[in-house]
């Protein structure tokens, strides 16, 4: 997760408030300010934040609240609003639109006609900030959303720049334009943009040379490229690891190139990212994306409220739904088959294997967990590499199963235990690991069938007959009528199985947007529910008692 340490400290400061006394509130403010300063946020910005928080606490009469829970709610709202204001530039960046085209036959050939012009994006920034990689990431981002995107390499200054962009573009299957022979970047940029405009591309991204403020020749070249291609939007790519120095860098660049928005890169491995975000926001320039890794999919759209929600552990269910939808998992044949099986009231081991494969496609576990309310506290303690390794190991074990075994509901292993031994030997693992997978499959099967039954047999369509009742009352009624309800809730939160086991329930939940929205509603309706869930996940004995009260572990 981006800025995991800062998020952990902010959540710790908020959770330290129990009774809501003045001393606790003052200590909370002190801890929040210390965390921000250590993340390289400017001292003046932190001082302003501290003053705003104190003023709002006085104005909202927090101290007069008799309920400790109401005090915590008000404090969380105040902190949330002020942190959002800290990273919000209050400027809306331009958004590209698809070209509305019509087809006309000219001289026997079909030609696409459009009254609109392509959205041209020019990238600028210092050397080594990650412009070329960010160009490809942005192209992939828009391509997934149905835009026709082209890349133009106008970087003739750095050796290997065109090779890098070409390699990235081919890997991502994105059209590109560049030249090994033409030394004039202005000519390359102009010809590339004209080529893609004639072919009616929705978005054209132009990569330029990295430059420093002292290199007047390169800055002149940048201005000339801008005049040649007439960009709709100019994006400056900045290294997030420079912290609050981002402000002076952005101001210096803006004097020469009137860029409209910023992409912050390398935000996944540096503690100073918070300082960079707040510093850029102070220049009233919107941050449109943040780079969170080396892969082409590691680019997150930046929204202040969403970003702060993740930091504070509130989650971003809508963002998670959009992320899952962008992967087009619903078009996968294996996923379609799984849905059909669940409709028929069955869930095979192959379906379970498909769910595990889909889960790996979603990206690092901590990034996904940060979008689910309350999970970032727990999953921040789990390594992405270790978790992915466990999930892959589960897939390897299932690869050692026969077609007959994969197509069954797991009962064949109960009837013929010798199959478990054979699968263990074939995959080079212990018998107990195979048994754990079968156990997780049974839990996932129960959850999938129950979710389908609750939605009237239609995946992704909420159909709860008690929708008009309060959320907690509905939850309790479900718990009473469904012995496996608590187990399913723990599965949705990534628990109940421990380690890689919890991934099955989480993957199933993320393939079902309606279930994710219901989970978020339950969390919001009862703030104590998440705390209780976390305590249960940390205390296996407590959770076991809860399971026994609700009728065992689902037939395990």
Curated annotation (Swiss-Prot):
Sequence segments annotated as region (Disordered): 450-470
Residues noted as binding GTP in the record, renumbered to the chain: 125-132, 207-211, 265-268
Main location: cytoplasm
Catalytic activity: GTP + H2O = GDP + phosphate + H(+)
Biological processes annotated in GO: SRP-dependent cotranslational protein targeting to membrane, translocation
Renumbered residue ranges of the record's region G-domain: 1-312
GO terms under cellular component: cytosol; endoplasmic reticulum; signal recognition particle, endoplasmic reticulum targeting
GO-annotated molecular function: 7S RNA binding; ATP hydrolysis activity; endoplasmic reticulum signal peptide binding; GTP binding; GTPase activity
UniProt EC number: 3.6.5.4
Ranges where the record places region M-domain: 313-556
Keywords linked to the UniProt accession: Cytoplasm, Endoplasmic reticulum, GTP-binding, Hydrolase, Nucleotide-binding, Ribonucleoprotein, RNA-binding, Signal recognition particle
Family from the record: Belongs to the GTP-binding SRP family. SRP54 subfamily.
HAMAP family for the chain: SRP54 (MF_00306)
Role description: Signal-recognition-particle (SRP) assembly has a crucial role in targeting secretory proteins to the rough endoplasmic reticulum (ER) membrane. SRP is required for the cotranslational protein translocation for ER import and preferentially recognizes strongly hydrophobic signal sequences. It is involved in targeting the nascent chain-ribosome (RNC) complex to the ER and is proposed to participate in the arrest of nascent chain elongation during membrane targeting. SRP54 binds to the signal sequence of presecretory protein when they emerge from the ribosomes.
Subunit structure: Fungal signal recognition particle (SRP) complex consists of a 7S RNA molecule (scR1) and at least six protein subunits: SRP72, SRP68, SRP54, SEC65, SRP21 and SRP14. Interacts with SRP101.
Protein name: Signal recognition particle subunit SRP54
Organism (species): Candida albicans (Yeast)
The encoding gene: SRP54
């Amino acid at each position: 997760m981006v800025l995991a340490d800062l998020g952990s400290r902010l959540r710790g400061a908020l959770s330290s408030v129990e009774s809501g006394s003045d001393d606790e509130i003052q200590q909370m403010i002190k801890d929040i300010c210390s965390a921000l300063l250590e993340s390289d946020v400017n001292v003046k910005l932190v001082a302003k934040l501290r003053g705003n928080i104190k003023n709002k606490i006085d104005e909202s009469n927090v101290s007069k609240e008799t309920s400790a829970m109401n005090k915590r709610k008000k404090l969380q709202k105040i902190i949330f609003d002020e942190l959002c204001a800290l990273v919000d530039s209050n400027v809306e960046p331009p958004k590209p639109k698809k070209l509305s085209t019509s087809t006309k036959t000219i001289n026997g050939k079909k030609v696409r006609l459009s009254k609109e012009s392509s959205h041209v994006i020019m990238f600028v920034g210092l050397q080594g900030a990650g412009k070329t990689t960010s160009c490809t990431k942005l192209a992939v981002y828009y391509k997934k959303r149905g835009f026709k995107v082209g890349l133009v390499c106008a970087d003739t200054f750095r050796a290997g720049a065109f090779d890098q962009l070409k390699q990235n573009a081919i890997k991502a299957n994105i059209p590109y334009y560049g030249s090994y022979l033409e030394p004039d970047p202005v000519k390359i940029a102009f010809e590339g943009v004209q080529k893609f405009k004639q072919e009616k591309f929705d978005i054209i991204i132009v990569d330029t040379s990295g430059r420093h403020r002292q290199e007047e020749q390169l800055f002149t070249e940048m201005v000339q490229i801008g005049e040649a291609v007439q960009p709709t939007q100019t994006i400056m790519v900045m290294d997030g690891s420079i912290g609050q120095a981002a402000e002076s860098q952005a101001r210096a660049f803006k004097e020469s190139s009137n860029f409209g928005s910023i992409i912050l890169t390398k935000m996944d491995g540096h503690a100073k990212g918070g300082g960079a975000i707040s510093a850029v926001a102070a220049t009233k320039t919107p941050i449109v994306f943040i780079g969170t890794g080396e892969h082409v999919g590691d680019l997150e759209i930046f929204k202040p409220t969403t970003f702060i929600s993740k930091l504070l552990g509130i989650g971003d269910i809508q963002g998670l739904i959009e992320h899952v939808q962008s992967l087009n998992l619903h078009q996968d044949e294996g996923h379609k088959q799984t849905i059909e099986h669940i409709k028929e009231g069955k869930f095979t081991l192959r379906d379970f294997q498909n769910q595990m494969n889909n889960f790996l496609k979603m990206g690092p576990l901590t990034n996904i967990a940060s979008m689910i309310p309350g999970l970032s506290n727990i999953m921040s303690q789990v390594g992405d590499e270790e978790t992915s390794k466990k999930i892959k190991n589960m897939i390897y074990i299932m690869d050692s199963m026969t077609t007959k075994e994969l197509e069954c509901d797991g009962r064949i292993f109960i009837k013929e235990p010798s199959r478990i031994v054979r699968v263990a030997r074939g995959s080079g693992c212990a018998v107990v690991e195979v048994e754990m997978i079968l156990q997780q499959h049974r839990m996932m099967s129960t959850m999938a069938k129950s979710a389908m039954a609750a939605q009237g047999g239609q995946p992704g369509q909420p159909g709860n007959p008690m929708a008009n009742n309060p959320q907690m009352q509905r939850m309790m009624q479900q718990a009473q009528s469904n012995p496996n309800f608590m187990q399913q809730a723990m599965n949705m939160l990534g628990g109940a199985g421990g380690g890689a086991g919890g991934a099955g329930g989480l993957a199933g939940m993320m393939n079902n947007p309606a279930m994710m929205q219901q989970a978020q509603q339950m969390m919001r309706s009862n703030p104590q529910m998440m705390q209780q869930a976390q305590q249960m996940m940390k205390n296996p004995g407590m959770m076991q008692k809860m399971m026994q009260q609700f009728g065992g572990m689902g037939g395990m």
